[in-house]
Amino acid sequence: MTDNKIYWDQLKKTDPRFTKRINKGFGEITTIDPQWQIGKMTEVFGPVGIGWGYTVQYTYTEQLVFAEVSIWTEAYSNIYGPVCSVQKLWRKTGALDDEAPKKAMTDAMTKALSHLGVSADVFLGMFDNSKYVEKVAAEYKSLNKSKVTEMKGNT
């Protein structure tokens, strides 16, 4: 037996409280709160900038912004990426979308983190199964209760 999936197994389950179902025009997808993903990486690897981190490279055209994100863990030599995402710089109204770089970066980061196993259950389509989501929600609820009890015991 190897430890090849040690991190994947710690990162794969997503707390349903930090997901949203949205319609993208081609069907519904589950989105994941990026702050939750950052918290999950911090839980497993330590603080951003110490146990893990990311780099972002932006490229702009007249109409688009591209964000290339690379993720590193434990040592900067353990790096994955870049993973790219693109967003339109202009809204349909003709106004500049000043959130476009952030949207591109967040999407690229989510994609890069998925390769490490973060929220693998969402990307594997398991959130399309309501029984699975209920089971994971119950697991997280129980885990959160035990953390609250532990915190009360330490005060």
Residues of each region from the PLM?
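Intrinsically disordered, low-complexity segments enriched in polar/charged small residues
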Residues: F26, L116, E150-K152
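Positively charged, aromatic-enriched nucleic acid-contacting surfaces
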Residues: I32-A138
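Interfaces that engage single-stranded nucleic acids at replication/repair/recombination sites
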Residues: T2, I6, Y132-T155
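N-terminal, Lys/Arg- and Ser/Thr-rich interaction peptides
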Residues: M1-P34
